[in-house]
Amino acid sequence: MGIFNFLKRKNEAEAAPVQEIPVQDAPVQETEAPVAEEEQPALTSLSAFTEEALPSASGLYPHEILMLHLAPAFHPENNSFQKFWLDVYGVCSPQTILDRLLEQGYIEVSGMEEAISHLTVTKLRELLQQFGLSPAGKKAEMVRRLLDMEDQSQLEALCPERYFVRTEKGEKELKENWYVPYLHSHRNAIPLTIWAASRQIHQEKKDFSQILLETLKAGAGAHLNSHDYAQYRNACLANYAALQDAGMDQEAFHCLCETAYYDLSGLGDGETLLQDESPASLRSFLTAKEKLLSGHFMLVVPAVKQSLRQEQEQRELSDEDFRVLLLEEFDGVELPFQLFSNEECADLLLAVIHDDTETPARLLDSAKARLQEELSAL
């Protein structure tokens, strides 16, 4: 959308008079509400969760795939399990899941190498010194030094703990169902459960990447519906990180560009004046944006600047090519108002990346001049 396009609609319309309705004061009776005892939320049972879900092609349910992902942190017995197993997933006996995965050949008990690899660097140094070996080097070098010892009997006695490792079958299952560990690690940020995702994947035959993108777009879009553009911008930045973690680099880059685009638009939360096209409302809106530019207007936050710089470096693009790429991403985004044209936005972002202060100063002056011209025309 062009700069100030919204001004072309009914900019000479007058606001309808507002009728004031008298309100009669009613007596207020003060009552003290009873204080309810704090109740712990009821936990959902595992059976209720699995009724919502569908198993993988191999027959594993999402909570079993999650255990497959976390299995290398556990021993064959005497484990302590995290609280989320019961609170989030309704699993009362995580050890039973480990035992079943072992029986089915998804995991196996590790050998000495995995046992030593779980030791801290401090403990490794102590062992090396105990056997008269050099404690220098990186952790992997210290582990290899211990494993190269001819007599492993003493080492076996000092490191009796064993861990699980995934078999080839287990690695294949986890690779095919990567959505489970992904959603587990993002469970506080993405409103999609492993149970619901499993049903969409296996019943609706949808790719998880598509499901994830639809979920993130819906969550961010709710802010646009309420004209909270700053919150939408924050959601886009969060989605950039979430999509990067999912390996969806192109979709992530679009979210980063959209974040910067909204940063440069000058739009904030609760921009309801954009819905009222009366001259008075338009004047108030433009005056507020003029004050915004006259103050300390931050173009983009440091995190966005750093991410844009990294994106350009990783793509090994010249400034000219990166500018073209930015314009392509801006082209699909519609804004109700812009302080800068798309070309100016691209120039500003390149200036920010390279710590150029002259270009932003010039373009800020141009934007202020445009605002003043529009205000004079009202």
Where are these regions (language model features)?
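Residue-level detector of solvent-exposed, low-hydrophobicity positions
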Residues: 10-14, 68, 170-171, 185, ...
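Basic helix-extension-helix modules of the SAP/HeH family
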Residues: 4-6, 34-187, 367-378
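Short, flexible helical or helix-coil boundary motifs
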Residues: 11-14, 105, 123, 131, ...
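N-terminal intrinsically disordered, low-complexity tails
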Residues: 9-37
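Flexible coil/linker segments and helix-coil junctions enriched in charged and small residues
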Residues: 8, 143-146, 276-283
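Extended amphipathic alpha-helical coiled-coil/heptad-repeat regions
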Residues: 187-366, 370
